[in-house]
Amino acid sequence: MSVTLQRMKTPHERLSEIVGNLEVRGAYAQIGLGTGESARTILQSTPLDKKLVIIDPYGSMGYRMMDDDKLGYPSIKVSRDNNVQIEILAGLYKLALESEKHFLFYPMEDIEFYQRFQTGIFYYDEGEQIRTNEYGFVYFNAENCIGDLIEGIRFMNERTPKDGVWIFNNINDYNTRQQELLDELMEEANMDAQWESDFLVATKTIEPSDCLKPKQEAYAEDNETLTADVSTDPSITYH
């Protein structure tokens, strides 16, 4: 009797499989660029009619990690410097050119993005101005503090349609309490969460009530609710 052993997928193979099989409204987003390898995998697997939004601060800066240092204080990691970042971005733009895929890069911290673009992002495509405030796929790649991750979940919860998928990387860096907190947040956000060997994969089970409304409620740093009034412009296509 012969036994066939099934090879486990690598993280990039699994990521490519999820993105490639996804059929959902909205843009795709990656929070945190890292080495750029995950972005390459996502970009290669993204449909031609989708835009990938990448959010990452450009240049050397310190940011808090999930875990504490040896003395119990929040550990700090310095992001890659300008020269490394430009090399990573150059490789991504080369891939985009060769594959005819497109991505939008926002050089800022994730919290700043959430504050600035509560009512959606604008871009031009074939001469048409487009506004989108939906994210059907989100890859949380930021190795930052749990508080920032919560803000990202709050922001995306209002903007992810039914069957949208979130993937959380670096799950082995979370302690037991952080994993429990993520489970609680996924339940509150109506996400069906599955812990895998490399990722937490969560799928939206219902439509958010106000995902496409011009008046979009969002969370601010002081935990107050902001309402941004956006006038309806007939020349803009809303996605």
Annotate the PLM regions.
Residues 2-5, 12-239:
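S-adenosylmethionine/decaboxylated-SAM
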